From Swiss-Prot:
Family note: Belongs to the RecX family.
GO cellular component: cytoplasm
GO biological process, one term: regulation of DNA repair
Protein name as catalogued: Regulatory protein RecX
Cytoplasm in keyword set: yes
Length: 270
């Protein structure tokens, strides 16, 4: 049995208190607690506490400490239940305390996976223009349940997906101006898959791209790659030269007819 002899406010934190006790051998430092725990357990000078009571006080102090760490972590941005649990584990908090902290955070509505999933879907679709497949994978990695994700993705209709995909295509296709139209389409297809768009949405967007095919730019790309390969293979003669040129340009996505026209031009130049 011990008796509280003095309660002192810490100099560095006005919300924490040092508790001094006497176990029968004079006053000594006992432990420190947060203001919440001080009030919760009614700690005051003259109060007698046994080992069981002390154990409860110290346990609740650890819970409160972990709770405040979680609140601080949440102050930067919303987090999922799993993210909070992982954060506390990295802080070497015990599982029993983690469970209590998460339960309190859920009760106080500091964490809510449903609200998080909806906000995350809106942000990733409107700001980063990610497709639903990537958004779903990221939410699953954050521990959000599949049913909640399905509900949140209703915020991202197909029309919006197509709009975003077309914006991405418009931005990216400028960097493929020296590629054949076919190769540009393949690269844009790969980009949209990486961004998380469905095959259906990608096909619709690339069909619209077909209507924008620029013959002049296609010819510029053909001449760019054709001349580059001609310089590379001009040490060969006749059939060997043309065969290597055809293979290289075909791999770049140019049609047989386009390649033949270019080779005919080179024959006339020669």
């Amino acid at each position: 049995m011990a008796v509280i002899t003095k309660i002192e406010v810490q100099k560095r934190s006005k919300e924490r208190f040092n508790i001094y006790i006497d176990k029968g051998q004079g006053e000594e430092y006992g432990f420190s607690v947060n203001e919440v725990i001080l009030i919760k357990h009614g700690l005051q000078k003259g109060l007698e506490i046994d080992e069981i009571a002390l154990g409860n006080i110290l346990y609740n102090e650890e819970v409160q400490k972990a709770y405040l760490q979680a609140i601080s972590y949440l102050s930067y941005q919303m987090r999922t239940k799993l993210e909070i649990e992982d954060f506390l584990r990295k802080k070497e908090v015990g599982q029993a305390i983690i469970s209590e902290v998460v339960s309190k955070l859920l009760h106080d509505r500091y964490i809510n996976d449903k609200e998080y999933a909806i906000l995350y879907t809106r942000t990733q679709s409107n700001v980063n223009r990610k497709g639903p497949t990537v958004i779903k994978r990221e939410l699953l990695n954050k521990g959000v349940q599949d049913l909640i994700i399905t509900h949140s993705l209703q915020e991202y209709p197909k029309e919006k997906q197509i709009e975003n995909a077309l914006i991405l295509i418009e931005k990216k296709k400028k960097s493929y101006q020296k590629h054949s139209f076919l190769q540009m389409k393949l690269k844009l297809d790969e980009m949209l898959v990486r961004k998380g768009y469905s095959r259906d949405v990608i096909q619709i967007c690339l069909e619209e791209l077909k209507d924008e095919k620029d013959d002049e730019k296609q010819q510029e790309a053909l001449h760019y790659h054709g001349n580059k390969y001609y310089e590379k293979y001009k040490k060969y003669d006749g059939w060997t030269l043309e065969n290597k040129m055809k293979q290289a340009l075909y791999r770049k996505g140019f049609s047989i007819d386009e390649i033949e026209i270019f080779l005919q031009m080179k024959r006339e130049e020669g």
